[in-house]
Amino acid sequence: MARYLGPKLKLSRREGTDLFLKSGVRAIDSKCKLETAPGQHGARKPRLSEYGTQLREKQKVRRIYGVLEKQFRNYYKEAARLKGNTGENLLQLLETRLDNVVYRMGFGATRAESRQLVSHKTVLVNGRVVNIPSFKVSANDVVSIREKSRTQARIKASLEVAAQREKPTWVEVDNTKMEGAFKRLPERSDLSADINEQLIVELYSK
């Protein structure tokens, strides 16, 4: 399955909520009708079945983190093998993706931009170049921007935008050095309350 390259607001309208796929700290403009789906008949929102509700939640989370279907299913399988709550495990695994950590640290304005930074060999993990967006970051790993890339205007702009967002407590960032430490796995209370991971567990448990 190919990665979606179309309008980002269309995805947010499809899910009925801001997926934070666009850069900036403000909520999506009020002109963008999140309560209606895109398309000619978007206003006619069908009543979803139980399966439909579960599927929509899975699609929403998958799109937030920019993960393809096969990858997402593999994350779920790994989460189910781990001890503890499967839904929380799933979110924690998604949060350890390098592209997501780069976004959380503020080096990329969006997860898509952060993924691009990683793919273009702009990011170091513990001093070594890593160009795999799905690379799993571990506790106490240090993520930084390559010295020759630190003058990039988009990275500086991203840090300015990130300064206006609520700072994640599980990462520690030095904007001057353009490096940060992944201190720990985020707890469920650290993450968005707008996600109902239990619906995803129910979907994959069928």
Curated annotation (Swiss-Prot):
CDD domains: S4 (cd00165). Keywords: Ribonucleoprotein, Ribosomal protein, RNA-binding, rRNA-binding. It comes from the Bacteria. InterPro entries: Ribosomal_uS4, Ribosomal_uS4_bac-type, Ribosomal_uS4_CS, Ribosomal_uS4_N, S4_RNA-bd, S4_RNA-bd_sf. GO terms for molecular function: rRNA binding; structural constituent of ribosome. SMART domains: Ribosomal_S4 (SM01390), S4 (SM00363). Residues 96-156 form the S4 RNA-binding domain. Part of the 30S ribosomal subunit. Contacts protein S5. The interaction surface between S4 and S5 is involved in control of translational fidelity. Belongs to the universal ribosomal protein uS4 family. NCBIfam families: PRK05327.1, rpsD_bact. This is Small ribosomal subunit protein uS4.
